Amino acid sequence: MATSSVSKGCFVFKPNFKKRKISVPIEDYFNKGKNESEDSKLRFETYHLMWEQMKCETERLQEELNKNLFDSLIEFLQKSHTGFKKNSGDWGHQIKHREIPVAALVLGVNVTDHDLIFRSLTEALQNNVTPYVVSLQAKDCPDMKHFLQKLISQLMACCVDAKPKEKESIQVTQKMTHCSMDPLSSWYMTVTQKTHPKISGKKRTTSSKWQSPPVVLILKDMESFTTKILQDFIIISSQHLHEFPLILIFGIATSPIIIHRLLPHAVSSLLCIELFQSLPCKEHLTTVLDKLLLTAQFPFKISEKVLQILTNIFLYHDFSIQNFVKGLQLSLLEHFYSQPLSVLCCSLPEAKRRINFLSAHQCENIRRLPSFRRYVEKQVSEKQVALLTNERFLKEETQSLLENLHVYHTNYFLVLRCLHNFTSSLPKYPLGRQIRELYCTCLEKNIWDSEEYASALQLLRMLARDDLMTILQKCFKVFKSSSEKQLGSTAKRIEEFLAQFQSLDADAKEEEDASGSQPKGLQKTDLYHLQKSLLEMKELRRTSKKQTRFEVLREKVVNFIDCLVREYLLPPETQPLHEVVYFSAAHTLREHLNAAPRIALHTALNDPYFYIKNEALKSEEGCIPNIAPDICIAYKLHLECSRLINLVDWSEAFATVVTAAEKMESNSATTEEMNEIIHARFIRAVSELELLGFIKPTKQKTDHVARLTWGGC
């Protein structure tokens, strides 16, 4: 940069002002290129609001499911070290207080959910037991030194009531103190004596009752810790237990037997272990499905194939509730992104209000829906013309159809729960043991056309009186909570059935018992008379078979349930406008959640436009776009090579492709500088391909690399 001054000196040249990058609002991503939708912002806001409601409901469910487990843990921790400050000369008392209290927390193999559980557990312990709660992972503790360093650093960070000067001294001692239990014990005694009179706040409400609050150490992944670290720490801690009240919580993913496999008897005898078991993952899944999908509270629903994908990933991959909820969130996002009419996927009063403001283009979208077309075809000719030409009449009819869809879902889930109560206890579970299995079957087809449903009805016709009454009482509670007019009489009908069962007199019971008992006349006879009597009895039963009062009433109950199923458990595809609330793009969801890594990697490198929606990246098959990412260019070039790739030839080909785009951008840089930049870009692209496993160095030739993959992917 030049200056017109003739004197010598230093001149300051301010850099050019760089424009601040304007961040694109998230709702703008709902616009598909040129086809900009006028309600994209409203759809995004609706999605965000619904997801926040579903997220809050999920968190509340997790708290309720973990409440019993946390309460048991807190009770165990509060009972531990109760006599910490009691000086007793009793030998048994001294031996007992040399044992470290251990809570073996078996959480299952859903490791991805453990962090959330431990986070909630830490908060619960700090609110109810002690402020000194430390969590350690095996990856942060390769040896005893790092183990104690992490323990001391986190423990000293728990001292929240210290003054600024005390905090500085704590940080200094944290750096200078030798990592051992002696200074840690003395620090604990000093801190508890200082902070005990001043303890206040939510986190110390319960711990203030303790003369010396315990230190809780959570080992999140106990199986991953080395045996030597665990043994040394337990032995050392047991010697300082009289001055450093330690409680251990072992996070176990497999089985409690792992404790005895990792620790010898001499070490495990220093522990006072109590086992705690979390709820099975399948119960968590059933509860989440029950509160998020099997309810009319949230209008968003998913199809049978989408639900099958989410449950299969859960059951056959990770057992993770968090991943299941993320898959549900992705389904919700894809639905609001791909379906323009998802703007009506909200509460019924709000949906009716939004229908009044629909544009002409949105009305055409309603007319294009396959379910609405089938509905129009069933109407009379005059109504068909009005629906296809009159927007006002269309909006009124849409409001009515959405209201019918809401009533359909309310009745659907009530009858579904009733049917599940009847079939969940049948032998061999013909319709599934879990309600999600029954729900998938009902979403897929007419359930009454299946063989499993027919076999379930046969088994229901053989239920005993007590079992049938128990099931009817459960169904009565389900329908009693309903306020719908159509199902209001159902609860009364079930109540009548229960009254009739209770009014069965003793004669009916005796008649039922007599029908299954053998006559008393066949006590002693020969073979001929026995055969003759059996034939007569068989003929008598065939000609004069009469049902008891109980059998007649049981048949009425089964027929009544069958009528409910045929009337209310219709597949969602039969309902007009079901596309507004149902997400059915199972293929899209499978690509995102259960994609094959190798195929996805090949697609990204071979066709970057597939993931980066940039029109400049479009190219014909076999061609290399000039402005593609460097790794894509290097990958396409390496596909044309044989088993050994010459790095020089590969670099020259890479430079040839890249310079075709560079020359059009700027000509200010010199040729040497451009070559150095291109060479550095090539080295980085080759290193990335090596990291991904496409190539590797070879000792056959120094300037060559070996290709590791063949074929299209």
UniProtKB/Swiss-Prot annotation:
Pfam families the UniProt entry points to: ORC3_ins (PF19675), ORC3_N (PF07034), ORC_WH_C (PF18137)
GO cellular component: DNA replication preinitiation complex; nuclear origin of replication recognition complex; nuclear pre-replicative complex
Record keywords: DNA replication, DNA-binding, Nucleus, Phosphoprotein
Keyword Transmembrane: no
Keyword Nucleus: yes
Modified residues (Phosphoserine): S23, S517
Annotated compartments: Nucleus
InterPro entries cross-referenced by the UniProt entry: ORC3, ORC3_ins, ORC3_N, ORC_WH_C
Alphabetized GO MF terms: DNA replication origin binding
Top-level taxon: Eukaryota
One Gene Ontology biological process: DNA replication initiation
Family: Belongs to the ORC3 family.
Quaternary structure, from the entry: Component of ORC, a complex composed of at least 6 subunits: ORC1, ORC2, ORC3, ORC4, ORC5 and ORC6. ORC is regulated in a cell-cycle dependent manner. It is sequentially assembled at the exit from anaphase of mitosis and disassembled as cells enter S phase.
Functional note: Component of the origin recognition complex (ORC) that binds origins of replication. DNA-binding is ATP-dependent. The specific DNA sequences that define origins of replication have not been identified yet. ORC is required to assemble the pre-replication complex necessary to initiate DNA replication. Binds histone H3 and H4 trimethylation marks H3K9me3, H3K27me3 and H4K20me3.
Protein name (database record): Origin recognition complex subunit 3
Organism, scientific name: Spermophilus citellus (European ground squirrel)
